Design a protein with these regions (language model features):
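Bacterial N-terminal signal peptides that target proteins for export
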Residues: 2-19
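Short stretches within intrinsically disordered, low-complexity N-terminal or propeptide regions
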Residues: 5, 25, 29-32
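Bacterial N-terminal signal peptides
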Residues: 16-28
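Sequence signature of WD/YWTD-type beta-propeller architectures
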Residues: 31-520
């Protein structure tokens, strides 16, 4: 029977919604519960994720969170100096912020603080108000999309057939599969998608390393403004030259070292050399200065002006001495017009730091270099001690980013195109699974407290997702290539290139380890 026979269906629906959530800009008359009294807490409320004291961009999705305080119901008020506050009355601890008023509030408060007031209704009928959370809206936006890899953790990596490259619209919660490998499909068995990289944050110029289970090939797939090329040579870690004419790559042979007690695993790279792939001539060159027979070279990255190639280099020791291998940060001058290389320079020595160095990434203005340091090896993902460091390339001074790091592994970082944001993967949430975090990098060269990639009900999303999210790369728009494009390039390429060898070469093997094994 109709409980409200004299009311229209839209009005009846509205009445059911009003007690739960409302935003004040809507003009809906929602009344919070009647309370017997109020009390004030001197402390901040405990919320998950920890969105307290963070700086976020004006174009980020709502920072939904869960209140980890007892209460029969909750009141939340999000406000700034300008614009209309967002008010939410909820019977559940999950706080879902309406996206339209959230966007309007952030836009009205660029460069200004945003406060969050949380109150909990106790069983006594008393409303307990916590101290106000103060965050800050940066004036500069972040690139609109994030591209990352999702894969199952460690030994169950192919459960539910999950390894793939995804993109996420940072202004909302839309995630899109770019390519997903379903291992339970016999045609895909043994197939893997791995390192991906973009040319200066452009979504339509990218390279992707793959392994094709049916053929055993490990090609690099280049998507360049709609043209798809499958390069039939095993490349590892990739880096675009700023001109877009070249790709630096590493040749690696990763193997897993498993332990029965203590640290559960390590990664050993048994073959590290760096080479150059030239797109126009379809040639591969292994410059002798960066493919030395007695050194492991890896983690190539270019300076924004293209005049230097930065990389990491460590002594070539046998696997039994894996804990003794520490990598130095190096660079070498390069002239694109002539193809000439300068001499290798040491930028930062592991003997000076006492730590191994990996994953150098330079800010778009060329002034700062973000990198990882940890006790040994070239792989920070398996090292809980891995932290992010920042070097001022103008002075060569470096510092540990105390505001950013945790007591868990930090790695896989990349810059936004405007240099005001960087994203990285961290295991701080549970010690096992990498999750993407963002940090604001202000005009004074200071990195701010990071925040977790927003999700609808993020506590439930991250706690129930048994996958690592790593290799996060910021891009300025949506990637225009989907599943069909990548599968065709892997299994039935229209444009397949067998690159010609040019100049002196290294004899080091060129293969990656098991798909996803060390890539965490």
């Amino acid at each position: 029977m109709n409980a409200h026979p004299n009311l229209s269906r839209p009005i009846r629906s509205l009445l059911r919604l009003i007690p739960i959530v409302t935003a004040s800009f809507l003009g809906l008359l929602a009344q919070p519960p009647v309370v017997a009294g109020e009390a004030s807490e001197a402390r901040l409320p405990t919320i998950d994720p920890d969105y307290c004291g963070v700086t976020f961009p004006p174009n980020i999705a709502p920072l939904d969170f869960r209140i980890q305080e007892p209460g029969l119901s909750f009141e939340i008020r999000i406000a700034g100096a300008a614009g209309t506050p967002v008010e939410i009355f909820s019977r559940k601890p999950q706080v879902v912020v309406p996206i339209k008023p959230w966007r309007a509030l952030l836009e009205a408060n660029r460069g200004q603080p945003i406060t969050i007031q949380v109150a909990a209704m106790r069983e006594t009928g008393e409303l307990d108000r916590f101290a106000v959370i103060t965050n800050f809206v940066a004036p500069e936006p972040i690139d609109g999309f994030l591209v990352y890899r999702r894969l199952n953790w460690q030994f169950a990596r192919y459960a539910n057939g999950s390894i793939g490259i995804y993109q996420r619209n940072l202004a909302d919660f839309q995630e899109t599969e770019l390519v997903r490998i379903k291992e339970r499909n016999a045609d895909n068995r043994g197939t893997c998608v791995n390192c991906h990289t973009f040319l200066k944050n452009q979504p339509d110029v990218m390279a992707l390393h793959a392994r094709v289970g049916t053929t055993g090939e490990k090609p690099m797939i280049i998507a360049n403004k709609g043209t798809i090329t499958t390069v039939a040579k095993p490349f590892g870690l990739l880096a675009w030259h700023p001109s877009g004419h070249l790709l630096a790559f590493s040749q690696n042979m990763f193997s897993m070292i498993l332990h029965s007690v203590g640290r559960n695993r390590d990664v050993y790279d048994g073959a590290g050399d760096i080479g150059i792939y030239t797109l126009a001539s379809e040639t591969v060159t292994m410059p002798p200065k960066i493919s030395l027979p007695d050194r492991f070279e890896t983690w190539p990255t270019w300076s924004p002006d293209g005049k230097y190639l930065y990389f990491c280099s460590g002594p070539k020791l046998p696997v039994q001495q894996y804990q003794e291998i520490k990598y130095d940060l190096m660079r070498i001058a390069f002239d694109e017009a002539s193809g000439a290389w300068g001499d290798v320079e040491e930028v930062l020595s592991s003997k000076t730091t006492g730590l191994s160095i990996a994953e150098p990434r330079i800010s778009p203005d060329g002034n700062h270099l973000l990198f990882c340091m940890f006790p040994y090896s070239s792989f920070p993902g398996t090292q809980p001690e891995s932290d992010l460091y920042l070097m001022d390339l103008r002075t060569k001074k470096y510092q540990r980013l105390d505001a950013v790091n945790s007591n868990r592994s930090e790695c896989w970082h990349s810059w936004s195109s405007n240099g005001r944001w960087f994203v990285f993967s961290s295991k701080r949430r549970d010690g096992l699974l990498t999750r993407p975090y963002f940090s604001y990098f202000d005009s004074q060269g200071q990195a701010h407290k990071p925040f977790l990639l927003p999700q609808k009900d993020p506590a439930d999303f991250y706690d129930s997702l048994p996958q690592m999210i790593n290799l996060p790369e910021l891009v300025t728009g949506p990637v225009p290539y989907g599943q069909r494009t990548w599968f065709k390039a892997m299994f039935a390429p229209e444009h397949r290139v067998v690159p010609k060898q040019s100049g002196e070469t290294s004899d080091a093997p060129a293969s990656m380890g098991e798909p996803g094994s060390p890539m965490n």
